[in-house]
């Protein structure tokens, strides 16, 4: 909320995401709920811009610190582990495997409960956005074990697109691996 000619203002929700407090949407919710204080005043307005070098910002009574180093964790998610960092049903999550990490990290993308494989966790919101945003067209490769052989119509359906929660996905390429 302070402006100087040499300092770049940033949206408050973006700053909170960069500092590992919450995702941008999560930060918006915190702002709407009055959990964020800038220079001693509760902020409810979404889209507000702040000067990270000057403004005093706290969330839920805790002052946020300067930008921490970005962390990137490659995790081989086992089956029957929830990709989220917490689970209201009390199931095992990837957070249970993280131990003591000095900053909040989050998974980039997700793997289903009964899936296993590489999952990247980070506190770098910009990197996560680059990897996951459809406009960036980052290719992801999945190896899938099936019972039996897929029918031609099923492969065509994968190539033309399949509706899943959150949108439609389609394979660019489908092939049977030799020796599998």
List each language-model region with its residue ranges.
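Basic, flexible Lys/Arg- and Gly-enriched helix-loop patches that mediate nucleic-acid binding at interfaces
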Residues: 2-180
């Amino acid at each position: 909320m302070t402006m100087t000619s040499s300092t770049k203002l940033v949206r408050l929700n973006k700053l909170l995401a960069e500092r590992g407090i919450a995702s941008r949407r999560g930060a918006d919710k915190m702002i709407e709920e009055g959990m964020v204080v800038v220079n001693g005043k509760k902020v409810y307005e979404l889209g507000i811009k702040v000067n990270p070098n000057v403004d005093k910002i706290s969330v839920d009574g805790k002052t946020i610190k300067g930008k921490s180093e970005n962390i990137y964790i490659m995790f081989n998610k086992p089956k029957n582990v929830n990709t989220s960092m917490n689970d209201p049903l009390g199931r095992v999550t990837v957070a249970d495997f993280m131990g003591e990490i000095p900053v909040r990290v989050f998974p980039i993308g997700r793997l289903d409960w009964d899936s296993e494989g590489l999952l990247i966790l980070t506190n770098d919101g910009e990197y996560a956005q680059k990897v996951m945003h459809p406009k960036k067209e980052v290719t992801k490769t999945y190896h899938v074990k099936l019972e039996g052989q897929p029918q031609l119509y099923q492969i065509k359906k994968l190539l033309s697109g399949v509706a899943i929660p959150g949108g439609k996905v389609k394979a660019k390429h489908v092939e049977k691996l030799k020796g599998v």
